Amino acid sequence: MGVLDHVSEYFDCSHGSSKRHKSLQTVDVRVLIDCEGCERKVRRALEGMRGIRDVTIEPNAQKVTVVGYVEPNKVVARIIHRTGKRAELYPFVPYDVVAHPYASGVYDNRAPTGYVRNTEYDPHVSRLARASSTEVRYTTAFSDENASACVVM
């Protein structure tokens, strides 16, 4: 990165058209990878895409990690278009991140070991994974830690 690139960030010479810079991000995509040929096909489809810096493929976890200045939906569309394989954004996160990893909407048998379904993208599932306000009220009503709790017991 030269001096001209550094100085051009401070001055806008575009004459009305604004160019939005994409940020460097990591995109995880779930793709069914059966063999080394499938792995090579996915890698070649992504390496030709503009803005991609690194492609890492984990065939056992059915996971492709892309690092670069790209949009996640464009990466998924490129994999689907070029390879003909079904692809989606990686729906699993490590179980340490989720508050209730064994709730009915979060736990998934098809998830790799140590991962559960991401509740951030599906609001219906996330509602099941959290305790409701009435549920919290009932559990704290008889708590020893609550000073204004009921002393029936």
UniProtKB/Swiss-Prot annotation:
Residues 24-88 form the HMA domain. It is found in: Membrane. A metal cation binds at C35, C38. InterPro entries: HMA_dom (IPR006121), HMA_dom_sf (IPR036163). GO terms for molecular function: metal ion binding. The keyword tRNA-binding does not apply. Keywords: Cadmium, Lipoprotein, Membrane, Metal-binding, Methylation, Prenylation. Coiled coil: none annotated. Gene3D superfamilies: 3.30.70.100. Heavy-metal-binding protein. Binds cadmium. May be involved in cadmium transport and play a role in cadmium detoxification. PANTHER family: COPPER TRANSPORT PROTEIN ATOX1-RELATED (PTHR22814), HEAVY METAL-ASSOCIATED ISOPRENYLATED PLANT PROTEIN 25 (PTHR22814:SF318). This is Heavy metal-associated isoprenylated plant protein 25. It comes from Arabidopsis thaliana (Mouse-ear cress).
